[in-house]
Regions:
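N-proximal low-complexity "stem/linker" segments adjacent to membrane-targeting elements
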Residues: 1-49
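Conserved donor NDP-sugar-binding/catalytic core segment of glycosyltransferases
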Residues: 130-167
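Terminal low-complexity segments of carbohydrate-biosynthetic enzymes
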Residues: 266-388
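Conserved nucleotide-sugar donor-binding
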Residues: 195-212
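Acidic donor-binding/catalytic loop of UDP-sugar-dependent glycosyltransferases
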Residues: 62, 113-138
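Short, flexible, basic/aromatic active-site loop/helix in glycosyltransferases
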Residues: 166-193
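Acidic donor-binding segment of Leloir-type glycosyltransferases
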Residues: 33-89
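Acidic donor-binding loop at a coil-to-helix junction in glycosyltransferase catalytic cores
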Residues: 219-225, 239
């Protein structure tokens, strides 16, 4: 599939990957945004510093032809396209993005840049002019992956679905602020956001190899990849400076994604119903528990190294655990991310009935009250306190 591509430029730092199925109409704008990449001073990026890989999978239109014609008109852009007909069982974005990321990683390793990274976007998305340089700046701080902001392209502010989307964004940004208060991480400080999706996601080639590549699932493959990174204790930054603009189409190419979410909001608007979302009281308890568990993990790891016997904390019952079960999980886990994934599953079973989902407007009000209260208190008092 990729055998006809020229070798990567020596020292290429970024490989941009774009899965495309019947995207002949949208791709020119997507590619134009990549061809116009600049540094923070407005100077064009060096042509050899990045390349773009497009995989036209199971297309019925002229997607591949459009890419080739664009490449001819923009010879400075290192743009490559491959075509593939995937079997029905594999004809989904997860498989397409995996094939792209695997090839991007291979080429970056061949190029030899020590900080090489894979940058994922979509065929209906326009990246900001400083997208790549902003990703590189975040990765230079030592993080392993970057999730950027995904904004609606030319959205009508009077559209009912648009209003629902803005309220949803407000909810998740308030969540991110609450999480930062309760369990702050030095590599993902505030200001940050909540998104880490395929339209705007980057990770180092080294991190990609470390987790064994992109999980092959029909949809939400981006979420599965981030979960794998977290499970391996790799550092994911949610950067507000890394931005893209995506289409607001309701007929998308995947079973579950932004277009599916927009359709769900439209249906709720038509029936005058509100979305139900996670209860902020449960979120508060969850993140305080995680902060406590993180502290216990660090102490346990140090004690295991020194051979000391560490007394266990008194809070495991809040997660539906006995002390014996907690000690067992601490012994089995090879990373904090793996430990938290197991404990969180038990916590959700233990607390779902206690804190059921609530309407979006109620959740926003609760979060605003929680965040306002925490904003007025010293951070040392907030972090790590367990809510029961």
């Amino acid at each position: 599939m990729w055998h006809s591509l020229p070798p990567p430029a020596r020292g290429v730092q970024a490989s941009v990957i774009i899965p495309a199925k019947d995207e002949a109409t949208n791709l020119p704008a997507t590619l134009a945004a990549l061809a116009a990449q600049t540094d923070l001073h407005g100077q064009a990026l060096l042509p050899h510093s990045f390349e773009v890989l497009v995989l036209a999978n199971n297309c019925l239109d002229q997607t591949a032809r459009v890419v080739r014609e664009f490449a001819t008109r923009h010879p400075r852009l290192r743009l490559h396209v491959a075509e593939i007909k995937l079997p029905k069982a594999q004809a989904h974005v997860g498989q397409a993005r995996r094939l792209l990321m695997d090839e991007a990683c291979r080429r970056l390793e061949q190029g030899g840049h020590p900080r090489a990274f894979i940058a994922s976007t979509d065929a209906d998305t326009r990246v900001s002019p400083t997208w790549l340089i902003s990703i590189a700046a975040e990765l230079a701080t030592g993080v392993d992956a970057v999730g950027g902001r995904i904004l609606m392209d030319n959205a009508d502010p009077t559209c009912p679905v648009r209003r629902c989307q803005l309220r949803d964004a407000a909810y998740y940004l308030l969540r991110a602020r609450l999480e930062d208060h309760l369990d702050p991480t030095p590599y993902d400080p505030w200001p940050r956001h909540h998104q880490h999706f395929g339209a705007n996601l980057a990770l180092t080639a080294r991190a990609y190899r470390h987790v064994g590549g992109l999980p092959v699932v029909p949809y939400l493959e981006d979420e599965a990849l981030v979960q794998s990174l977290v499970r391996h204790d790799l550092r994911v930054r949610h950067s507000p400076t890394v931005k893209v603009f995506t289409s607001g189409r309701q007929q998308g190419r995947v079973a579950v994604g932004l277009s599916w979410q927009l359709r769900q909001w439209a249906e709720l608007q038509q029936t005058q119903r509100e979305p139900l979302v996670d209860n902020p009281q449960r979120l508060l308890a969850e993140w305080q528990l995680r902060a406590q568990l993180r502290q216990t993990w660090q102490q346990y790891s140090s004690a295991a190294t020194s051979g000391a016997l560490l007394p266990l904390p008194s809070w495991p019952a809040a997660a539906g655990l006995s002390r014996a079960a907690l000690r067992r999980e601490l012994t089995r886990a090879s990373s904090f991310g793996q430990l938290w994934e197991k404990i969180r599953g038990r916590f959700l079973v233990h607390t779902t009935r206690r804190w059921p989902a609530v309407p979006l407007s109620v959740a926003i009000r609760m979060l605003r009250e929680q965040v306002a209260a925490l904003d007025s208190r010293p951070s040392a008092v907030v972090a790590g306190q367990l809510c029961t």
